[in-house]
Amino acid sequence: MKVYAAPFEKFVNLADARLGTKILSVTDDWFADANRLFQPTPAVWKEGVFDDNGKWMDGWESRRKRFEGYDSAVIKLGVAGTLKGVDIDTSFFTGNFPPSASLEACFLASGEPDENTAWTEVLSSVELKGNSHHYHEISHDQAFSHLRFNIYPDGGVARLRVYGVPHRDWSKVTESEQIDLVAALNGGRSIACSDEHYGSMSNILNPGRGVNMGDGWETARRRTPGNDWVIVALGHKGEVEKVIVDTLHFKGNYPDSCSIQGAFVKGGTDSQIETQSLFWRELLPSQKLTMHAEHEFAEQVKAIGPITHIRLNVFPDGGVSRLRVLGKVSR
């Protein structure tokens, strides 16, 4: 079982490039493109690699400041959401990391921030160390769509992970509209799994198809009786009409079969939900899977009414690239 450095790491990384997060403006990224902050893969060191501006670094790096002030980057999150925590990662930045950093946020239904935008400080200035992860909890009920990441006075940061719960205005979704109820962009999140040795459980809810085998959820080889599983909270309660299980890129390591259970959960913690999931109703009976393919199940889906959570069971183990649970929202 994966050990998380901070409890909030189980939430969706709202600042993931795969969700569409990008830099809108930056005071300076002379040495390294600020958009590298959002890459889902860990930062790497490339020994002896230089470009026209100096040593190639996997992250955002500004020039040495020779005047007053500090550097900042304005960020559009791929999906707006309420913030739970942040990881400011300075991996491989040793003599060139910022001594401190802070984070501000705002919510805009449309458009981009300008000089009149009111920013809310969600993380006051914190000290940074070189080649380190810095985990800080954030507690704000408000949803935010944009961030302003400040580093004092200059330097380099490898990755910025901003964990939270995606936000969607469900009042604009009609009851006749079929949507992916578990998509990360719709607020779906993986909350527990039996194992995620090779790939994060949250990957299966990302938009698009997986880019490679690492862009999915894969368990270790099971050497004991039983099967692997992952529990997903829907972005909104709804009735399921179709399920898509995608094993793209998984060829010698795809599950032999899968099934799905569902439940309407009222209250309780994530750990309590994990225990209760053993007794959830069958939504999709066991279905055979094949390698490197999308599997659509509609006629096989049982009508069990509105649900809030699903449990994907894979037998006995293996990898799944994406999971889509299509249906209509329930009011």
Swiss-Prot record:
Hydrolase found in the keyword field: yes
InterPro entries: Allantoicase (IPR005164), Allantoicase_dom (IPR015908), Galactose-bd-like_sf (IPR008979)
Signal recorded as keyword: no
Reactions performed catalytically: allantoate + H2O = (S)-ureidoglycolate + urea
Biological or metabolic pathway of the protein: Nitrogen metabolism; (S)-allantoin degradation; (S)-ureidoglycolate from allantoate (aminidohydrolase route): step 1/1
A UniProt-annotated Pfam family: Allantoicase
MF-aspect GO terms: allantoicase activity
Keyword terms of this UniProt record: Hydrolase, Purine metabolism
EC numbers, comma separated: 3.5.3.4
GO biological process: allantoin catabolic process; purine nucleobase metabolic process
Top EC category: hydrolase
Family (UniProt): Belongs to the allantoicase family.
Protein name: Probable allantoicase
